[in-house]
Amino acid sequence: MKELTPEQIQENWNKLIQLVKDTFPEDYPDNRREKLLKMYHYFEERMCLTPASGKEHFHNAHPGGYVEHILHITDFVQQIHDVWSRNGATVDNFTVEELIFAALHHDLGKVGNLAEDNYIHNDSDWHRKNQGMIYKHNPRIEYMTITDRAIWILQHFGIKMTENEYLGLRLTDGLYEEANKTYYVNWSKDNQLKTNIAYILHQADMMASKIEYDQWARGDHDIKVEKEVEVQKKTEQSKAANQAFKELFGE
């Protein structure tokens, strides 16, 4: 299982908070930025350690995986938005701020409710080893879809969203969510989605999830850690050799 160091978890959290500050203006009297920061402060301790999924063969099923995934998708939505724009797609009927808002909060429900985590550690060694179920759903909280809980949390903190943001957030999971089918598969001209925000978000989410899975499957993190350990070991050996030389022959 991939593991982030405490320093990496803190660094990712700092990046997330800075992204919120950079994206949303201080628009008094309805200061959405202030409300968002209040919400993130409330969830900080838990959100920092929240995984992005419960199974290791899905994506980012490790402490800190949620924030890491959110940083990935917010990066990818901007890249994909640029690709769509350069190739002639209509992207002028929604804003980049709306795009980032939806990307930031489409999986917010994974943090759980106001008091309890959505994911708890699986206490079954058999399921962890044989099925990769690192986490399980917390039976102490009310069942909701991740999207429904995300919207509920946002309204609890008084955070308003535009129609574009709502649809983008609501539809980020694409056809993996059965309830989204009527939005994506609609034969009526009048009822088809009128902006591309949901398509861009879904592409970015798929891209982030797939890349995270590929990195886990290849063992990229383990290889990186092994290299870092090897470099550290060589550095320590070099320091020890230099110290021994000085002790034998002086400065």
Regions found by a protein language model. Give the residues of each.
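Divalent metal-dependent catalytic cores for phosphoryl transfer on phosphate-bearing substrates
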Residues: 59-64, 68, 80, 92-220
